[in-house]
Amino acid sequence: MKIEFFEETNFSYRRKQDLEKDLNLHWIARNMAGDKVGDIPAILQVLQHPLTTESEIEKRQQVVTAACENSSVTYQLRDRIVSLSENLTRGLHAILDSRGKHLMEQTMIGVHVETIRELVQGLSEISQMGAKNPEIFKETAFNYFYDSFCEAEPAERLEEQLALVQNLDAFKGNGEIVLEGAIGEGFSLENVEVVSVCDKAKRAGSGIFSGKKGRVIASEEVYQSGVQFANRVVLELLEQCSPFLQQWEEILQTLSRQIIFLAGCARMYERGLSVGFYFCMPKACEEEAEKLYELALALQSMEQPIPNTVSLKEQRALIVTGANQGGKSTFLRSLGIAQVLCQEIGRAHV
């Protein structure tokens, strides 16, 4: 299952120095981002997803254009995806941390249930965003992301998953469990029933001891035994959901990196327009222009830095024009600074 906003080439520089040298990211991070930026080598690694073919560059330029022209939706997606990714990672860490420890089964079940529930609810919210904005998610370059998302998690399946996770721990109150369904790869709770533990306890305890008090004690013991059995069954089922959670953790990490990048592009696009910069996203392959910059590639690692004059036969680009001493270079430096900040903390003030 592959879900992403744009393609990324599996490529990395042989030396970190080459990556730093390309656009002087180390200098930007050290001098402009301050203490908030954190581990500079880690940031450089996050920023490193270069494109090497014309089709990849063209595809991503279309996605960047869609992100800039629909910035409010881009920001909503960023907030939802980043939050979902962070919560899922924390939940998986909590699940792993609970294994091998002498914790109550109810506690371990609660950790599993909450992690699964938050993931499914978050995926459902993303699906609803697409349904409410079909003109963006189906008619712009965002469809590359949304089509693959819907293929992996159809709306009908999400409804079933949502109904299941909302009632997954309902047994806590009355001693009853009914779980059934086959829902998604790695998330199958199929034909499983542990029903009416309380009734079984009452029937089993009615003839064990004479007297009212004895029956209550017996019923309670059998009831607790039934609940413990039910907890073990549910915990084993929830453990089977781990592949589902791990798969989405990997997907959401990729989506988070990409949507933060797109949100940074949209933010700088808005900022540029507000101060009077003119943006052009050329389509004619034979065009050439001076002072050619592409918003999507401005902070990416290429074998050679983007020159001042670029032939559009080889790559799409964005033109930034303005009067002499009009702030073009300052804007481009701000773009680099903002991208470093956006990749690390999700926001930037320029």
Where are these regions (language model features)?
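Short, charged/polar, low-complexity loop and linker segments
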Residues: H93-G100, V233-P243
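Extended, Lys/Arg-enriched charged tracts that mediate electrostatic binding to polyanionic substrates
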Residues: N133-V192, S256, I260-C265, E270-S274, ...
